[in-house]
Amino acid sequence: MARTPSSDRPERGRGGERGDRPNRGRGGAEQTPREREESEFVDKLVHINRVAKVVKGGRRFAFAALVVVGDAKGRVGCGSGKAREVPEAIRKATEQAKRNMIKIALREGRTLHHDAYGHFGAGRVILRAAPAGTGIIAGGPMRAVFETMGVQDVVAKCLGTSNPHNMIKATFDALINLASPRHVAAKRGKKVGEIIGRRDGAAAAAAAGV
């Protein structure tokens, strides 16, 4: 039986025809909707420590992890997990953070709409909106929240505690109190332009020292 001439065979590029297939995941399989959703999130490990439980036979040691997860577009959540191994504790904390995510409206996609205050336990936090180019001026645990949320310019300060759990929860308490001009206008029955005009006027007066 005669062989087919090489000139009649279909040409194959480097790596065959696989490069033309979109959404290829690990192992050459297409990414599932869950995998694409998880790839959109940014997670940061804020704190991990070893804990012990006293039982009849002695002490049982485990690890507790605190994780912050966000999509860099205004959504952010925090969670804690405990397990005998560090990776499992981080996985549990990450899953809990994804379930506890909240949506925060950002001004110009980079900062907060207005100043906010929050507290949890002995911790109190102050969040201030900042002009472009300021950057994230905040302590470690709070910085992780803003970075995963997508905030680029903010000034934050924590008072009364150095416990990362209290700092994170106080920060979320402040974020929940934020409201966009559209939400405030709808609540007061006014136009968005009136709310923005008053906000800008108050900011200019504060800058002038009036």
UniProtKB/Swiss-Prot annotation:
Residues 41-104 form the S5 DRBM domain. One of its GO terms (cellular component) is small ribosomal subunit. One of its GO terms (molecular function) is structural constituent of ribosome. Keywords: Ribonucleoprotein, Ribosomal protein, RNA-binding, rRNA-binding. Residues 1-40 are annotated as: Disordered. InterPro entries: Ribosomal_Su5_D2-typ_SF, Ribosomal_uS5, Ribosomal_uS5_bac-type, Ribosomal_uS5_C, Ribosomal_uS5_N, Ribosomal_uS5_N_CS, Ribsml_uS5_D2-typ_fold_subgr. Signal peptide: none annotated. Residues 1-23 have a biased composition (Basic and acidic residues). Pfam families: Ribosomal_S5, Ribosomal_S5_C. GO terms for biological process: translation. With S4 and S12 plays an important role in translational accuracy. Part of the 30S ribosomal subunit. Contacts proteins S4 and S8. Belongs to the universal ribosomal protein uS5 family. PANTHER family: MITOCHONDRIAL RIBOSOMAL PROTEIN S5. The N-terminal domain interacts with the head of the 30S subunit; the C-terminal domain interacts with the body and contacts protein S4. The interaction surface between S4 and S5 is involved in control of translational fidelity. This is Small ribosomal subunit protein uS5. It comes from Paramagnetospirillum magneticum (strain ATCC 700264 / AMB-1).
